[in-house]
């Protein structure tokens, strides 16, 4: 960034970053590199980088002793950014020292202080047209939008509009100016209060505004959620009662859900009753319908981007309601298309519901919601949290997927929620299989929400059958020795060809051999023994040629298996068919070759006897 305008007083906010004076650039990099946290180069990277992968590259430069700020500004300058753009970013960071440094170099710049009254409010069309689905109650006609005090009209049975009795003053009086005693929930950027207005309970979602520089960021997320709730209506999407932008307060008003979140009911928070399997599958189907409806809206699909068990509310009839659309995005209905977004440093807990392509590259698509919904299915089946407490720092998804790959689908059945009576195996196996496909590592391997909903609806009837239909053994895998803990015992097939049958010691082949319960076994193949002592003569040969008719009649002598002085082996050649008394394997006699060169057959021995 060689400076062609090095004289002070000659700098303009429209000056490109490539023309930034080297002295000013060096001092600016020194200030940002010396700071840690949000005022350092990391805080600058959160606003200039497209994904966390770019931040990782900058970290490598920093580890090599280079300036992270210089690398960031160099990459950003290639987008034709100006000094004025840099000052806007520094103002958003709240870095007054860096701002004063640039201004002291002669840059005439007036900071733009905007409030929410000056920000453009979205203009909604008089009539919103979208694809009418089976459960779609019809298009919603948004009310006239103003900035000071906006009320969202409700719909009666005929679909006409009627005003609500909610006012911002009634909310202030009902919550005593948002006192902590009425706080019932809290998120990353909002707080939830309960208020009773005219014998009706409501939940007020108040966006946090601790600093003025956060207002712009929260305003965008406020508009994102507001736009989704105004444009789209569904029985399983939480309806909006009212919203306000009053005295720098951004709040959304919803009907109060008495049964709380799905996460709290699965964890039985405050001693609540566990949900039955019938309720759980009904909740999954309802949320799948809501997500599928948003994915198929026209002309743009809606990506929720924040599907989790904590964002699923249950009403007094245990009907699910999907909520929290602050991270929603609109994109054209192209099946193979995905978009890249800027990630924020917050929401780390929700990252457990996000796939790898979002965490690494910030890629967002409809398959992102499918992945998050698959995690919710695993929570519903097991009743566990996304990150298990014991063992620590183990994700539920990784544990179940590893079990499926190592031991098969049936190994996951031991993790079913034990707080309620067990469900049929066929029902749980189908849900585990569906969850495994939803949380596949590659996005192209995940099903669409249409396929997920169809699979859930076809699985629901199997819950009402007490007996499971017969299944093939091919679906049952042999376990790995590394995964034999806390899982039902599974028979392991043993290959006799891999067993090395060595000569037993004398202590084992002595008198204890008669009382041994497990007989020795050998395959019908060529068997080689060490040569017997030639000094035994014919007596040893005759004894060796006798084949015991039963394992209980065997009487082994230690001397019979003692190795001879020469190393020539004694080979017993078994024909393709031979017969043992009491067993009919064939009629061909067995021939034995002894170390002394004598040949004898079973037939000849019978004649001698």
Curated annotation (Swiss-Prot):
Residues given in the record as ATP binding sites: 184-192, 205, 308-311, 324
Modified residues (Phosphoserine): 480
Expression (tissue specificity): Expressed in inflamed lung macrophages (at protein level). Expressed in dendritic cells (at protein level). Highly expressed in liver and thymus and at lower levels in heart, brain, spleen and kidney.
Gene3D superfamilies reported for this sequence: Death Domain, Fas, Phosphorylase Kinase, domain 1, Transferase(Phosphotransferase) domain 1
Localization per record: Cytoplasm; Nucleus
Keywords carried by this UniProt record: ATP-binding, Cytoplasm, Nucleotide-binding, Nucleus, Phosphoprotein
GO CC annotations on file: cytoplasm; nucleus
GO molecular function term, any single one: ATP binding
SUPFAM superfamilies referenced in this protein's UniProt entry, alphabetically: DEATH domain, Protein kinase-like (PK-like)
Major location category of this protein: cytoplasm
Keyword Coiled coil: no
Site (Cis/trans isomerization of proline peptide bond): residue numbering on this chain: 110-111
Family, per entry: Belongs to the protein kinase superfamily. TKL Ser/Thr protein kinase family. Pelle subfamily.
Quaternary data: Monomer. Homodimer. May interact with IRAK4 (when phosphorylated). Interacts (when phosphorylated at Thr-110) with PIN1 (via WW domain) in response to IL33-mediated (but not TLR4 ligand LPS) dendritic cell stimulation.
Function: Putative inactive protein kinase which regulates signaling downstream of immune receptors including IL1R and Toll-like receptors. Inhibits dissociation of IRAK1 and IRAK4 from the Toll-like receptor signaling complex by either inhibiting the phosphorylation of IRAK1 and IRAK4 or stabilizing the receptor complex. Upon IL33-induced lung inflammation, positively regulates expression of IL6, CSF3, CXCL2 and CCL5 mRNAs in dendritic cells.
Domain notes: The nucleotide binding domain binds ATP with low affinity.
Protein name: Interleukin-1 receptor-associated kinase 3
Gene that encodes the chain: Irak3
